Amino acid sequence: MIQTGSIYRDATMKKPCILCVAITGSLPTKADNPAVPISLQEQVESTQSAFEAGATIAHCHVRNQDQTPSSDPEKFAALLEGLNEHCPGMVIQFSTGGRSGAGTDRGRMLTLAPDMASLSVGSNNFPTRVYENPPDLVNWLASEMKKYKVTPEVEAFDLSHILTAIRMHDRNELY
């Protein structure tokens, strides 16, 4: 049994659920935690372990040699190849988040047509910076996702983002 607050749940999970893993994230480094998978090989191995444990979606970030976030399509292509080989059937979701690049650089990997990609539909304040998602960029990312048949994972950080996502859906702007 797993205790969640005051509720106990059966660890066998009799009802279907979707488990999404973000094994790297955009910020943690080896200095923060030596177990953070940074290299492509580490990411594939960590994702494969999660897949074998039941995860069905992998939310993916890639890194530069110095462990900083990257939007490099070649890195995403290598990761996608490794995950498709070692995690057959897993849904692969790329991050288009702003820590890994500016403007349209954030969506250059969408040409690889992953199953899904994150789509932050508005700007918001993080503790140390503004996470900028101006309407023109959001619309461009959504159109690229639609062009390459990438399902968006809409990220909503406040109520206005939910309304924006509904409007985009109603206008058939989301794949």
What are these regions (language model features)?
Residues 9-35, 118-125:
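N-terminal small/glycine-rich loop or linker at the start of catalytic domains
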Residues 14, 51-52, 84-87, 106-115, ...:
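Acidic (Asp/Glu)-rich catalytic clusters
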Residues 16-20, 57-59, 89-93, 115-118, ...:
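Structural preference for beta-strand elements that scaffold enzyme active sites
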Residues 21, 69-94, 140-147:
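Alpha-helix-loop-beta-strand connector modules within alpha/beta enzyme cores
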Residues 22-26, 63-65, 95-99, 121-124, ...:
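Active-site beta-loop-alpha junctions enriched in small/polar residues
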Residues 31, 56-78, 126:
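Glycine-rich, proline-tolerant flexible connector loops at the mouths of alpha/beta enzymes
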Residues 43, 50, 61, 117, ...:
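Conserved, mostly hydrophobic/aromatic
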Residues 116-175:
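Catalytic alpha/beta core domains of metabolic enzymes, predominantly
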